Amino acid sequence: ASDVYKRQGYNYSSTSYPKMDRFYGELEGYVPTKGGIANIDLKRTAFGLKFIVTPPIDGTLSIGSYSLNPNIKVSADDSTLETSFMCTFQQIYECWQAENYTQDFTIILTWNRVNGATQTFEKIITAKRNVMTTINVNVNGSSTDSSLGVKEEDTPMGSENVDMNFNGGDLDDNEVNPSM
C-alpha cells in the first residue's frame, strides 16, 4: 500500500505513473557469432491520455486522478483546453507479455462554483497499451448536466522497430604490459 499525499488540492498516490514513453523487449537463446546481429523486438509499454476540456459556465474546473496527476484547471473565461500525455504502465513485464494489456484509473472532476459550492464527479476509465484514449470533459449548469465522455482513438500509435547492433569484438585475451 502506498501513502496518499495532498498536493495542490488533489489526492494522489506516491506510486504515480511516469509521464514518458517506454519500450521493452527481451532476447533469449542468442549465441554470439562473428558477424551475427542481435535483434530485439520491442513493444510499447505505455498508454496515452488526451483531455479535451470545455470550460465550465462559471467557476473553475479541476481534473485530477489518484495516480495519474494530470493537474488540469480550466476557468469559465478560458478557451477549450486540449492536452495530451503518455504514461508508462508500472507492470512493465506483464504489459509486455499481454497484447491487450489494460488498467483502470479514476478521473476526478472538481467544480468550484462562483456561488461557493463545490461539486465532485468521478469516472473510471480504462487505459490500454499502445492506445491514446481521448477524454471529453463538459460540465454545465446543474449537477445533472455534467458529462465525462471517453473515446478511444481509432488510429493506433503505430509501431517502431529498433535495431540494436553490438560489436563485442573478438574474445582473444589482450596482453597488457604496464610501463613504469
What are these regions (language model features)?
Residues T54-P70, V137-V150:
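Repeat-unit-sized solenoid/scaffold elements
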Residues Y30, G64-Y66, G169:
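Generic beta-strand hydrophobic packing signal
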Residues L42-I57:
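A short, Gly/Thr-enriched small/hydrophobic beta-strand-prone motif that recurs across taxa
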Residues V114-M180:
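Hydrophilic extracytoplasmic domains
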Residues S2-A46:
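Short, low-hydrophobicity acidic/polar segments
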Residues S2-R7, T60-M132, N174-M180:
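Tryptophan-paired
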